[in-house]
Amino acid sequence: MSNDTPFNALWQRMLARGWTPVSECRLDDWLTQAPDGVVLLSSDPKRTPEVSDNPVMIGELLREFPDYTWQVAIADLEQSEAIGDRFGVFRFPATLMFTGGNYRGVLNGIHPWAELINLMRGLVEPQQERAS
């Protein structure tokens, strides 16, 4: 990957956060180690500039749900397409959500903060209720 591409700059920022690169063929293995996990799927920031905002938004969003031991995986452009195909995702950026090792759903695109909180709550609250 060339160091001068917008995606490479984004990739380096995500790696600096300690997030784990994952491929489609290694995703299931990663999920056994990270039952409360999110997988960030990207597209070319030149075509979809909001891809660069997604890691910031998701990082903040996860702090709003501290009952989970969140771990974050990131997929490069090629693997984002492969993983997206597996989960029926065709709009990027996308964030796959897993709790207790189970797929809960996907957050597609960028949303206003209050809407994003509500979307996330809809994905994780049923799990919280079962834990009570």
Task: Identify the function of each model-found stretch.
Residues 1-35, 125-132:
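N-terminal leader/targeting and pre-domain segments
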Residues 6-17, 22, 83-103:
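A short, hydrophobic/aromatic-rich structural module that often spans a beta strand
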Residues 21, 41-43, 59-81:
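Thiol-based oxidoreductase modules, predominantly thioredoxin-like and allied folds used
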Residues 33-46, 58:
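Short active-site neighborhood of thiol/selenol oxidoreductases, capturing the structured segment around
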Residues 70-86, 90-92, 108-111:
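Charged, surface-exposed interaction regions in soluble eukaryotic proteins
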Residues 91-132:
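Non-catalytic, surface beta->alpha helical segment in thiol-disulfide oxidoreductase systems
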